A protein has these predicted regions:
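N-terminal export signals
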Residues: 5-30
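C-terminal segment of N-terminal export signals and the immediately downstream linker at the start
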Residues: 22-65, 69-71
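N-terminal small/polar loop signature for handling phosphorylated ligands or for N-terminal nucleophile
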Residues: 92-148
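Short, acidic/small-residue loops that bind anionic groups at enzyme active sites
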Residues: 142-164, 172-178, 312
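Conserved anion/nucleotide-ligand pocket segment
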Residues: 174-234
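Internal helical hairpin/lid segments
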Residues: 244-301
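ATP/nucleoside-binding phosphotransfer catalytic cores, i.e., glycine-rich phosphate-binding loops
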Residues: 288, 292-355
Length: 355
């Protein structure tokens, strides 16, 4: 699809139909509370790799985008996808109205599930975070996702989505790009090698290692291996005590947040510690804690992170390029990784997509 055709068809031809794909409201709670096996016992399912000509669905499971961001950021992202041979397909309910939600829960869940079930859609990249994913988790048909495994990417509020899909479906997902966020050269550099081997002329996966000794900080030295889990700290703690609670046992956990004061970060980390979540990890990678509001107290976010995490005696590094920042590293949820805090290295050891 050329750019002109795409821009002219954003509101109509690029939108999927509205056929019902949801479980009934009465069954939603039963789906939420259903027993599930410990998927961590089995190798994860890999979604198909991106390929030239593949259609990429762009839904809004949480908040919508402002009209000006749609015109500038989302269309810019769509153009970038076209530039690497992909075809963007935007859901109908993505532009924000008067609510903090892009659309009613049933509509957001339905549009997401339409992308899952549509065989013409090869991947799903969420449009933005904000709030709302938790509200639709009981409406997600996880069995349909298992039957139609696809690349699913998002961060921030979508921490709840990508981690839950991995847990319920044993499917690798991606804490990665969104359509209304920057898709700069750095972000593409650490996303495309994981998901688009054809574009990178890769015939097989090779270990992907990030190391920037000048920027990365070491809170606790050491080396650890584990499967990658994590995302936004606020969302992870919000899921605790629900059926979508994240199991951190043996994981390399990564955390980031935006706009939180040091004492609030302390409270969330303490909650995780009291629940045994931090002690269960093999290692921890700290992303960016941006727009931190430390005007009332002298204690900084960095001091808080050190005081809460150093006593764990597991490898912990900080200042990693992920979170609510322009340049973002993509974390494949469920893939085996190694954290080498001694040498300030983080390595993805397994393929994240099916070649």
């Amino acid at each position: 699809m050329n750019r002109r055709t795409f821009v002219q068809s954003l509101g109509t031809a690029g939108v999927l139909g509205s056929a019902s794909v949801l479980a009934s409201p009465a069954s939603a709670l039963a789906n939420t509370l259903s027993n599930k096996p410990n998927k961590r016992l089995f190798p994860p399912t890999l979604p198909p790799a991106l390929k030239a000509g593949m259609k990429v669905g762009i839904p809004a499971p949480a908040s919508g985008v402002a009209k000006e961001d749609f015109e500038k950021k989302v269309k810019g992202f769509a153009t970038a996808l076209e530039g690497i041979g992909l075809v963007p397909v935007i859901a109908k309910s993505v532009v924000a109205g008067t609510s903090y939600l892009a659309a009613p829960d049933e509509v957001r869940a339905q549009e997401f599930m339409e992308f899952v079930k549509n065989p013409d859609i090869g991947a799903i990249i969420c449009i933005r975070g904000g709030y709302g994913v938790m509200r639709i988790l009981p409406m997600i048909d996880f069995s349909a996702i298992q039957q139609n495994p696809k690349l699913i990417s998002g961060f921030s509020d979508h921490t709840a989505l990508v981690n839950t899909i991995y847990d319920r479906c044993n499917l690798v997902t991606f804490h990665g790009p969104m359509a209304a966020a920057e898709f700069d050269d750095f972000t593409q550099q650490w996303f495309l090698p994981l998901v688009y081997p054809e574009h990178r002329k890769q015939s097989r996966f090779e270990t992907l290692t990030y190391s920037d000794p000048a920027k990365l900080t070491v809170i606790t030295p050491g080396k650890a291996r584990g499967r990658i889990l994590g995302g936004n700290l606020t969302m992870i703690t919000a899921l605790m005590g629900t059926p979508y609670d994240i199991n951190t046992t043996g994981a390399i956990l990564f955390l980031e947040d935006v706009g939180e004061q040091a004492y609030k970060i302390d409270r969330m980390l303490t909650q995780m510690w009291l629940a045994g979540k931090l002690q269960a990890c093999a290692g921890i990678v700290l992303g960016q804690f941006t727009e931190a509001k430390d005007t009332q107290y002298a204690t900084t976010v960095e001091e808080t992170l050190r005081s809460r995490l150093a006593p764990l005696n597991i490898p912990v590094v900080g200042n990693f390029p992920l979170g609510h920042v322009k340049e973002k590293f993509t974390m494949p949820i469920g893939v085996l990784a190694e954290l080498d805090a001694d040498n300030k290295k983080f390595s993805i050891l397994e393929a994240a997509v099916r070649y």
